[in-house]
Design a protein with these regions (language model features):
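Active-site microenvironments of hydrolase-like enzyme catalytic domains
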Residues: 3, 73-119
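Solvent-exposed loop/turn segments at secondary-structure junctions
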Residues: 5-8, 56-60, 91-96, 122-125, ...
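Active-site-adjacent substrate-binding region
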Residues: 125-152
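Active-site-adjacent mobile loop/cap segments within catalytic or ligand-binding domains
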Residues: 149-199
């Protein structure tokens, strides 16, 4: 799912999108939905069944985004009770005092956006999600040593109470390009897939 589906990236000249806010767009080919498409395709290549919800949960109201995405999550869990993992893809926003957006990239060439796992701890069972996050983080650090930023624990729920195996995944920041985010999604998918498949 994408609670903040309209979050987007810095686009190169000639590839601009129609903004719906600061570093936001309803254009699914340029926002988090596109990153989710990439992640879903890569996970599917490992034989993992994926339900990718392409809804713009923040389209009508940014403040209601988590409530809207929770309704989608609960609907999918009822429809597909075999769902084991729920990933909520976002992008970060890191800027200096002047508002200049930072670009979070790996040391590898070509560069990929860095990824961070955000864990909500204001609900029962958060430790199960954290165990998954640690396992995924360790796998990815062994595969792509500069891909992952530190895991962040915050006193929120982020809908992670809805299902065990829930992760909030931030793919890059507003200063990154979409191409860097797509590379990161592929790298993350590889590590996530190999973690849950026990490889």
């Amino acid at each position: 799912v994408h609670s903040h589906a309209s979050e987007s990236y810095t686009m190169p000249p000639g590839q601009e999108y129609v903004p719906s806010g600061t570093f936001r767009t309803a254009d699914r080919s340029c926002n988090m939905v596109r990153v989710g498409d990439e992640l879903a395709a890569e996970l599917s290549s490992y034989g993992i069944s994926v339900v990718h919800d392409r809804t713009l949960h923040d389209g009508e109201s940014y403040n209601d985004a988590y409530e809207n995405s929770l309704a989608s999550i609960q609907s999918y869990l009822a429809k597909y009770p075999s769902i084991v993992y729920v990933l909520d893809l976002h992008r970060d926003a890191v800027q200096d005092a002047n508002g200049t957006q930072y670009k979070l990239v790996t040391a590898e060439d070509p560069a990929a956006a860095q990824v961070s796992l955000i864990m909500g701890v204001a609900h029962d069972g958060w430790q199960d999600n954290l165990r998954l996050a640690i396992a995924v983080q360790e796998k990815l650090e062994s595969q792509s040593p500069t891909l992952m930023r530190p895991i962040t624990l915050l006193n929120y729920r982020y809908n992670q109470f809805a299902a065990p195996g829930s992760l909030l995944v931030e793919v890059g920041a507003a200063g990154n390009s979409l191409d860097e985010a797509l590379r990161a999604a592929r790298l993350f998918a590889k590590g996530f897939a190999e973690t849950i498949l026990g490889r």
